[in-house]
């Protein structure tokens, strides 16, 4: 078996996690109490969904997941929510006091008290696996727990499970919408360790997803639930090939191989199509070519950056539902002819495709329409650097005046860590600039228009 363990850290990680597990359960026909009427092999057969669920002797399916937060309120919602019987109580770990939006509290003072307990739980889950493939880590880097405890856990996982791949689904601060003043500090400090300790990180940002909800689903005032349901579709499409049998299956380690040209250049953009409301879907059927095109639309990206400002290095298209390889090849060929979608010249092919015959599932009463086919794209584009340069700029404005720094130093951090993390990010921006530059063959037609 190729099991994956999901780790949900902090409020964002947990709430995205709730949406994901709700969707997985619906997709596999698992009831909220973990029973699965359709499962014929009792006691942990070799079914594909056993990559994400372990099975007890009593036929109950338990997610291979850990939820961690430094304060109890969000996890208490899981403990009392609709899926409370799904999880083992030991999988839900909460502390008593929160990280107060402070990276240093999450990473040093409070985080360090809880991290061993988390690793112990993760170890139990890992021992329960026959061939652990890797970890999916969900967190946000704006707050204190997601950024601080998130990076602490990643660092410790690198020590304990050095060879296993780690995929991060990371919510980054949005350009306009902010939930805390010190977001830029937390993000920069956290990205510093994401650079070292994740193999692939998929960037999400709330503002981009708000806009998708508003524009494509006509939701005037999207809530976090709306956002998370959309994110869970993306994550479900990514992991579908691990949980179902398909024609062109994609492994977690395959993402890494196909998307990451250099170890540091591993921050991905994601998009999903079709995002349409039930009213609209009733009247139209979308072809493979149409959904592929809309996945490449800048407005479909789940992070606020414009792929037209950069170049693609690689991209992974995961189709599900009624899709055949012939349609996919035709759609990809069309994309390659478009002038707006530019690839770096050292990566001529750049597409990895996966097909899964399980059609997309929707949450009853959710916003998305039930469709026959969908595509999720994860792409590695140099335009991601925009996300970092925005955060760096905000970081610089505050750090120049050393604003709020005492809160971090008071929790046992050293001021040198700020500048070290900031330099690391400056180097990352430089790396992106270099991979996007034309290779030295004297052909510099594209250099004039590149703006960074």
Curated annotation (Swiss-Prot):
Keywords: Acetylation, Cytoplasm, Cytoskeleton, GTP-binding, Hydrolase, Magnesium, Metal-binding, Microtubule, Nucleotide-binding
Sites marked Involved in polymerization: 452
UniProt keyword Hydrolase, yes or no: yes
UniProt: GTP binding residues: 11, 71, 144-145, 179, 206, 228
Top-level lineage group: Eukaryota
Positions where N6-acetyllysine occurs in the chain: 40
Pfam families: Tubulin, Tubulin_C
Any one biological process term the GO annotation gives: microtubule-based process
Entry's localization field: Cytoplasm, Cytoskeleton
Reaction(s) this enzyme catalyzes, per UniProt: GTP + H2O = GDP + phosphate + H(+)
EC numbers for this chain: 3.6.5.-
Catalytic residues identified in the record: 254
SUPFAM superfamilies with a match to the protein in the record: Tubulin C-terminal domain-like (SSF55307), Tubulin nucleotide-binding domain-like (SSF52490)
Region (Disordered): 430-452
UniProt cross-references to Gene3D superfamilies, sorted A to Z: Helix hairpin bin (1.10.287.600), Tubulin/FtsZ, C-terminal domain (3.30.1330.20), Tubulin/FtsZ, GTPase domain (3.40.50.1440)
GO CC terms, sorted: cytoplasm; microtubule
Gene Ontology MF, one: hydrolase activity
Main location as per UniProt: cytoplasm
Required cofactor names: Mg(2+)
Post-translational modification note: Undergoes a tyrosination/detyrosination cycle, the cyclic removal and re-addition of a C-terminal tyrosine residue by the enzymes tubulin tyrosine carboxypeptidase (TTCP) and tubulin tyrosine ligase (TTL), respectively.
Record: residues binding Mg(2+): 71
Biased composition (Acidic residues): 431-452
Subunit composition and interactions: Dimer of alpha and beta chains. A typical microtubule is a hollow water-filled tube with an outer diameter of 25 nm and an inner diameter of 15 nM. Alpha-beta heterodimers associate head-to-tail to form protofilaments running lengthwise along the microtubule wall with the beta-tubulin subunit facing the microtubule plus end conferring a structural polarity. Microtubules usually have 13 protofilaments but different protofilament numbers can be found in some organisms and specialized cells.
Family classification: Belongs to the tubulin family.
Biological role: Tubulin is the major constituent of microtubules, a cylinder consisting of laterally associated linear protofilaments composed of alpha- and beta-tubulin heterodimers. Microtubules grow by the addition of GTP-tubulin dimers to the microtubule end, where a stabilizing cap forms. Below the cap, tubulin dimers are in GDP-bound state, owing to GTPase activity of alpha-tubulin.
Name the record gives this protein: Tubulin alpha-1 chain
């Amino acid at each position: 078996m190729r099991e994956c363990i999901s780790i949900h850290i902090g409020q964002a990680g947990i709430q995205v996690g709730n949406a994901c597990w709700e969707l997985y359960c619906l997709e596999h026909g698992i009831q909220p109490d973990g029973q699965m009427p359709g499962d014929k092999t009792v006691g942990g057969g070799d079914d594909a969904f056993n990559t994400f669920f372990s099975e007890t002797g009593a036929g109950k399916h338990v997610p291979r997941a850990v939820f961690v937060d430094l304060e109890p309120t969000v996890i208490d919602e899981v403990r009392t929510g609709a899926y409370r019987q799904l999880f083992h109580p030991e999988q839900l770990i909460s502390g008593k006091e929160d990280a107060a939006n402070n990276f240093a509290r999450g990473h040093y003072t409070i985080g360090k008290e809880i991290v061993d307990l988390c690793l112990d739980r993760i170890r139990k889950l890992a021992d329960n696996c026959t061939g652990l493939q890797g970890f999916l880590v969900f967190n946000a880097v704006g707050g204190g727990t997601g950024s601080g405890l998130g990076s602490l856990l990643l660092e410790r996982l690198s020590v304990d499970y050095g060879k296993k791949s780690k995929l991060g689904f990371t919510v980054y601060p949005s350009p306009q919408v902010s939930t805390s003043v010190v977001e830029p500090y937390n993000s920069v400090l956290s990205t510093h360790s994401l650079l070292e300790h994740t193999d692939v990180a998929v960037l999400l940002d709330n503002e981009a997803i708000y806009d998708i909800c508003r524009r494509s689903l006509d939701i005037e005032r999207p809530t976090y639930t709306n956002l998370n349901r959309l994110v869970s579709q993306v994550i479900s499409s990514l992991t579908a090939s691990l949980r179902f049998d398909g024609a062109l299956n994609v492994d977690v380690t395959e993402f890494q191989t196909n998307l990451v040209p250099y170890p540091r250049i591993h921050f991905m953009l994601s998009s999903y199509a079709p995002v349409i409301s039930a009213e609209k879907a009733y009247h139209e059927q979308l072809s493979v070519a149409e959904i592929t095109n809309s996945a490449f639309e800048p407005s479909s990206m789940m992070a606020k950056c414009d792929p037209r400002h950069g170049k693609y290095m690689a991209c992974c298209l995961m189709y599900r539902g009624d899709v055949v390889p012939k349609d996919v090849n035709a759609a990809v060929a069309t994309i390659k002819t478009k002038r707006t979608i530019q690839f770096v010249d050292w990566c001529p092919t750049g597409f990895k495709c996966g097909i899964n015959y399980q059609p997309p599932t929707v949450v009853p009463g959710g916003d998305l329409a039930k469709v026959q086919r969908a595509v999720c794209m994860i792409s590695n584009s140099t335009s991601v650097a925009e996300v970092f340069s925005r955060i760096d700029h905000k970081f610089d404005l505050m750090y120049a005046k050393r604003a709020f720094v005492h809160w971090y130093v008071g929790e046992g951090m050293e001021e040198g860590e700020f500048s070290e993390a900031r330099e690391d990010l400056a180097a990352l921006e430089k790396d992106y600039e270099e991979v996007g530059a034309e290779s030295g063959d004297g052909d510099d037609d594209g250099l004039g228009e590149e703006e960074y």
